[in-house]
Amino acid sequence: MNRFVATAFLACALPCSAQSASDGIAEYRAMLADGNPAELWQAKGELLWKQSRGPKQASLERCDLGRGPGVVKGAFVELPRFFADTGRVQDLESRLLTCMQELQGFDAVAIAKTPFGKGEMLNIESLVAYVSGESSGMKFNVSQAHPEEKAMYEAGEKIFYFRGGPYDFSCASCHGQEGKRIRLQDLPDLTTNKGAGAGFGSWPAYRVSSGQLWGMQRRLNDCFRQQRFPSPGYVSDVTLALETYLGVNAKGAESIAPALKR
């Protein structure tokens, strides 16, 4: 009888404890939200957007993020999208690389090979914070009008469910079902509109644990690392396809980027 009572107590206490910890994390984030350090990256990003840089000594103020040259507000929530000038579906980071190469003369290939948090990659993270912040509070509306956009979504869905690696993991292993947690942190179900809105809609973000701002490309590459897969690479078709899948699933959700993460 005593063993039964103890087991019943633990069965009740553990979910309550996990929920209490989850609530505590949410409260902690809310306390920090008003002073999100990502604002420092946003401020730097705005300066970089307007500053003449690179071999061509030009600014990014003529960069077309999808709404016309120089238009920043509202662009982030419509990415990834197809761009006729490159013939590719591009996300924000991929498009920034294109503009940095075409307008400023930087070597996009060399930058893409730079480790996260180093060199020009630091500047891209600041630009990402600035551009995403200009669409904060707006709703995601990632297009599926072009055949290439549809193909990217379909590829992203397949990649999301692909299982492999030493752990036989897929993205769906952690993010394909409601109610999952890791280290007492809730994991959003990215196959649903609500979950994709909470997950996709909160990147880029300042990570308290690393003291750095992470873009979605860095987040996705780290997910592959955690699965023990080879790195897909910066702005690869794999990561762009996943972003398209998540972005379409998040249609109508409000962007809170740049957000705050543990």
Where in the sequence are the language-model features?
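Positively charged n-region of N-terminal signal peptides that target proteins for export
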Residues: 1-4
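Bacterial N-terminal signal peptides
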Residues: 6-15
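Electron-transfer interface patches adjacent to heme c in soluble/periplasmic c-type cytochromes
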Residues: 19-40, 50-126, 133-137, 162-262
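Hydrophobic, well-structured mid-protein blocks that either form specific transmembrane helices
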Residues: 127-131, 143-144
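Short, charged low-complexity linear segments at domain edges
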Residues: 30-47, 138-157
